[in-house]
């Protein structure tokens, strides 16, 4: 059987702020931000989920939030070079921190990085057009 990623979990300090960011990114996130667990399916079937720190600590009493740096790095294919630039502009224009402005990477992609409300790296990319 081929290995297939099916679930990505994000532990968040502020569910509402995190969901607002990912909605702006383009995820079809349900409107219920007062629950300790929220999830949505991406177009490829991968489940993207959020859990509050309180919920994680109830499930794992020994859980300690990581300190320093980001906890997870995510990369979302934007489809086109222009979409990378537009998504970066939309997110940074809404006040989210841009870590790396859009640039043409030597591996053949347009690439940019924005931080989500929990400080996680969210990369935006698309293949460079020939």
PLM segments and residue spans:
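Core segments of cupin and vicinal oxygen chelate
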Residues: 2, 9-57
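Short, basic, helix/turn surface patches
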Residues: 57-68, 125-130
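Hydrophobic pocket/interface hotspot
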Residues: 18, 22, 84, 91
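A generic structural signal for short beta-strands and their flanking turns/coil linkers
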Residues: 36, 46, 68-72, 96
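A cross-family glycoside hydrolase active-site/sugar-binding cleft signature
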Residues: 9, 51, 75-77, 101, ...
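Vicinal oxygen chelate
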Residues: 4-13, 39-42, 62-130
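Short, flexible coil/turn micro-motifs enriched in small/turn-prone residues
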Residues: 1-4, 103
């Amino acid at each position: 059987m081929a290995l297939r990623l099916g679930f990505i979990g994000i532990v968040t300090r502020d569910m509402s702020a995190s969901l607002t960011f990912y909605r702006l990114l383009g995820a079809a996130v349900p409107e219920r931000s007062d629950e300790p667990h929220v999830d949505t399916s991406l177009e490829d079937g991968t489940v993207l989920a959020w859990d509050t720190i309180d919920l994680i600590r109830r499930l794992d009493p020994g859980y300690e939030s990581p300190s320093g740096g980001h906890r997870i790095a995510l990369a979302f294919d934007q489809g086109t070079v222009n979409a990378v630039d537009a998504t970066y502009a939309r997110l940074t224009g809404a006040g989210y921190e841009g870590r790396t402005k859009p640039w043409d990477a030597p591996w053949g992609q347009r690439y940019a990085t924005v931080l989500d409300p929990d400080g996680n790296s969210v990369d935006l990319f698309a293949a460079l057009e020939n």
